């Protein structure tokens, strides 16, 4: 997605060898017009696949997921990273390791929001090592629902997340694919959408 790549080049900041900071439009402050375009692109790609739910993980996946769900006219569910007192029964959980935060969290979704009839599109902000998507897949499959595809806003192609997910049989479609960081600049691979 050319618009996204241009925004990454303009406002993204490289930290160290493998972290891209995009807090001015995705991971802290949200550019809703860009998120709306992201949602439209994902929705156009998956419009004929029978998607019934969009699922993401809090927090930075929520914005692109909600705009995708809006464009598809289906509900969006986000997995919570912390259990609260209102989630006391009927909870589907999985362990997820965060590459950026370097911690493992138990993420959860109330089972009443997913059913065996659901065809789910996972949307997330980043794909690095694939652990967030893997955790969401586990939760979705615990409910008996089907993962149709995984939509990623920014993929770190130099990490093994895509390979892990595709080898397990899940299609991955990314709007921006980072090949590497070179001389303080992002180098892109050809994106899927």
Swiss-Prot record:
Converts the preformed base xanthine, a product of nucleic acid breakdown, to xanthosine 5'-monophosphate (XMP), so it can be reused for RNA or DNA synthesis. It is found in: Cytoplasm. SUPFAM superfamilies: PRTase-like. Gene3D superfamilies: 3.40.50.2020. One of its GO terms (biological process) is purine ribonucleoside salvage. 5-phospho-alpha-D-ribose 1-diphosphate binds at residues 128-132. Xanthine binds at residues 20, 27, 156. The gene is xpt. Pathway: Purine metabolism; XMP biosynthesis via salvage pathway; XMP from xanthine: step 1/1. One of its GO terms (molecular function) is xanthine phosphoribosyltransferase activity. This is Xanthine phosphoribosyltransferase. Its EC number is 2.4.2.22. Keywords: Cytoplasm, Glycosyltransferase, Purine salvage, Transferase. Signal peptide: none annotated. Homodimer. GO terms for cellular component: cytoplasm. It catalyses: XMP + diphosphate = xanthine + 5-phospho-alpha-D-ribose 1-diphosphate. Belongs to the purine/pyrimidine phosphoribosyltransferase family. Xpt subfamily. The lineage of its organism: Bacteria, Bacillati, Bacillota, Bacilli, Lactobacillales. PANTHER family: HYPOXANTHINE/GUANINE PHOSPHORIBOSYLTRANSFERASE, XANTHINE PHOSPHORIBOSYLTRANSFERASE.
């Amino acid at each position: 997605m050319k618009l996204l790549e241009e925004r990454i080049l303009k406002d993204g900041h490289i930290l160290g060898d493998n972290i891209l900071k995009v807090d001015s439009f995705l991971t802290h402050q949200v550019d809703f017009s860009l998120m709306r375009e992201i949602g439209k692109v994902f929705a156009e790609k998956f419009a004929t696949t029978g998607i019934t739910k969009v699922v993401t993980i809090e927090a930075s996946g929520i914005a692109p997921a909600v705009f995708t769900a809006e464009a598809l006219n289906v509900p969006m569910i986000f997995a919570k990273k912390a259990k609260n007192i209102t989630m006391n029964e009927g909870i589907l959980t999985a362990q997820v390791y965060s590459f950026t935060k370097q911690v493992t969290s138990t993420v959860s979704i109330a089972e009443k929001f997913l059913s065996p009839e659901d065809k789910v599109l996972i949307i997330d902000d980043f794909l690095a090592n694939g652990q967030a998507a893997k955790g969401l897949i586990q939760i979705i499959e615990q409910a008996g629902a089907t993962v149709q595809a995984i939509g990623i806003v920014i993929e770190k192609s130099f990490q093994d997340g895509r390979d892990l997910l595709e080898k397990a049989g899940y299609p991955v479609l990314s709007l921006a694919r980072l090949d590497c960081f070179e001389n303080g600049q992002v180098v892109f691979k050809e994106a899927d959408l």
